[in-house]
Amino acid sequence: MAKSKVRIVFLCSSCGNEFAKWNGQCPSCSEWGTLSEYKVNTKSRTRSNGRPRSTTKMVDLLEKGKINRNNTGIPEVDRVLGGGILPGSMILLGGSPGVGKSTLALQIIPGLNSKVLYVSAEESEDQLALRAKRLGINSNLIHLSTENNAQVILDQVALLKPKLLILDSIQTIYSNNIDSIPGSPGQIRECGQQFLTMSKQNGVSVIVIGHVTKEGIIAGPKMLEHMVDTVLYLEGDPRFDHRVLRSEKNRFGTTNEVGIFQMSKQGLEEVSNPSELFLAERTKEVPGSAVFPALEGTRPILVEVQALVSNANFGTPQRNANGIDYKRLSMFLAVLEKRLGMVMGTKDVFVNLVGGLRISDPSADLAVITALASSAKDIIIPQDTVLVGEVGLVGEVRSVAKLDKRVAETEALGFKQIIVPQSNLKRFKKSNTKIKVLGVSSVKEVFSNLF
């Protein structure tokens, strides 16, 4: 019989790797001061007396056909997951406190129409029941547990045999194999590994809810994100009603799709037309406002960008960018000053994407730089005009992907004109649309048409 013994390891809180001795700098990820001491209960290594586990030919698995995903009943969630939850997959759902992680996890359950074990060490069973009642969820397929011991939870899974296990949250669960408090890097890694093994061996899907740090990353070792199959982030400012579900990692689908939701008394509600949501309160006839068709995955979303340029009367000029990359804003200001002769070095500059959105799509460049010029010159951009295009350092307007979808969404919302890169028009069929499509090759050409 294998003897249990305790060994000392040093675990990196950044990358999750363990080492036999302490170092000031992690040998794996090169971070400083991230190694902490942990006691691990292990069994002495002995040779297995049983027969080795058999292997499977890949061709035999392919002949079985496509594995069916389990639809959640929420199209926005299924879109981000790539078509639903794959049996035996492990999903990590992160987000800031109060953003709606637990609410979303509960709302997924009814659509699965399967037995689900919901484990919450943060709320009592009565509190969970009240939350489910508020969301209109009433099913005898849902089993609740407030256990926080990983071994006991695994025993509950073996007894109930659910199709889905929800852990809320991984930071509150501990394993007897690690001599440390719940939420420590060692505990998170050990518990994550145990639930991952169970998931793959039994075909049980697992949704792990994780807290995020003030830097916006999931708390705990990075190894947890490497373990799981899918990493989802639910984003949104608590001051606003809308939420955005993004995929940072997905072994079984794309990471480009997003799901848009709106928080209400009934929980998270899908937004079928995000463009109308983000343009609903747009102020008319004001300089510094422009609209562009962002492409999130395969879905175009019209978003308003606002810019404010004013004289810096209090020393060093301020630069503030919400929703876009700060370094990209600096590039736009340099292009305006160098290529168009606009003095921006003595100006306070503020840029904001309405609704608290965060966009990395470079096709927003033309709208942002035009909004900056509009505010600086105090000239209004026509309300029926949309701009799209990437801006280069020499002031050229470069092509963007999937222009046809962007134009179709723009036309559907009643806009009369869209300004696009000239290079895109070579492959674009104007006969398919009634909206005016104007091609430009430089920022200077855009300004001559608008200002």
Predicted feature descriptions by range:
Residues 124:
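Conserved Rossmann-like nucleotide-cofactor binding loop
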Residues 144-145:
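Conserved SAM-binding strand-loop segment of SAM-dependent methyltransferases
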Residues 96, 121:
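P-loop (Walker A) phosphate-binding loop of NTP-binding proteins
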Residues 116-120:
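Conserved RecA-like ASCE P-loop NTPase motor core of nucleic-acid helicases/translocases
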Residues 2-14, 18-81, 86-92, 99-115, ...:
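Peripheral, non-AAA+ core regions of ATP-driven protein-machinery
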